[in-house]
Amino acid sequence: MSNLSIFKIGVGPSSSHTLGPMLAGNLFCKKVAKKLDEIDRVEVTLYGSLSLTGKGHLSDKAVIWGLNGLEAKNLSTAIQDEVNKNAIENAQIDFCGEKKLCFNYEKDLIFSKDFLPLHENGMKIKAYDCKGGLVDEETYYSVGGGFVLTAAQLEKKGKNSNQNKKKKLDIELNNAKEALELCDKRDWDLAELSYRYELQFHTKEEIRAYCLEIWEVMQEVYYNGTHPNEDYLPGKLHLKRRAKGLKERVAMTADPMGIIDFISLYAIAIAEENASGAKVVTAPTNGACAVIPAVMLYLKNHTIGFSDERAIEFLLTAMLIGSFYKKNASISGAEAGCQAEIGSASSMAAAAMATVLGANAFKACNAAEMAMEHHLGLTCDPVAGLVQIPCIERNAFGAIKAISAARMAMTRKSTPMVSLDEVIETMYETGKDMNYKYKETSLGGLATNLKTVC
């Protein structure tokens, strides 16, 4: 399976809790496309983390967007508002974009605190006829990064169920060990390896165009974050946006440590856009969407030679590293804590930065390992169920750690003790051992100890 989908253009604030439920709604529409005449009502039940932090993450709204047949890439805030109003105030949805149905937001959208057995982010969608008979149903799991699997897919093949191999590939990459062996054999860096891998699924023109579109949108999101229409982020925290003021201050500073402020600016601006529900790039999740572009903006604005070609190499490297986390661990905060989101993004960015600065595959993987090693155990405890505190600032720290890890790996003379595959395995084990209160449920940590909210 191609790794390009590690980066997706969508809307905030969460890939697993916003994009995932929206995609589930889209998938259900496709499932019942030939039964529309029979359907009179739909009912959605959100479970586990989707329920516990669903309203703050807009999960309830997102599934409604999906059931209206809307897709994330082209979803504007104006369309969001129109569909929300129609569903909540007018009690109606345009099911699959083709049939108007009555929809009672209070009764047809159910928040259950129960957890479904296969994953922390579960949901069920049911369709009924005019007599109350069940027409169709499906159970979906939002497994992180905007990826969604049905219960049958998850039971059959676990996290790799969406990676059916239709043909024998010349290059198969399941972990960092295999990648390093191939790079050593062919004298490739990680960017070249990732490019050769993607050529098995796409033309060189398609790969280039996709990466440049992702990079263009990342820069657009940063600009929007420094030119906001509102001074405060949505939600009951009434959190003031900081990026605009931070940009004005760092532009005037002569502080030799000012580079840290620039990196923070890039990350905060993008993370604030995500928190507002605006367009962002999932990288590899929405909660961690600012880490990778912040490092790229640092390279573009503060180093020499970061061209479009280097940006493509950066993204190719990052998506390769991200695929190892997705295949062998998790990129879901609800499954493995924030280490799976910010940690994975920082690891991806570290390897990518090292690669575009000339590191071989071994040093790039060492950079990725160090970045994750120092995110191990990081909890996901969003205050008020919003992707704001501590999420926005964590993106800045993830970017700074990535840059530090890349530089440390490139100047290192000794042989690393820990491999990338070992730290990926450790992250996943740590996440599965972590108490559910600290995995995107807002039932522990800062989410309960911040007294001004609780």
Which sequence ranges carry the predicted segments?
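Extended hydrophobic packing segments that form well-structured cores
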Residues: M417-C454
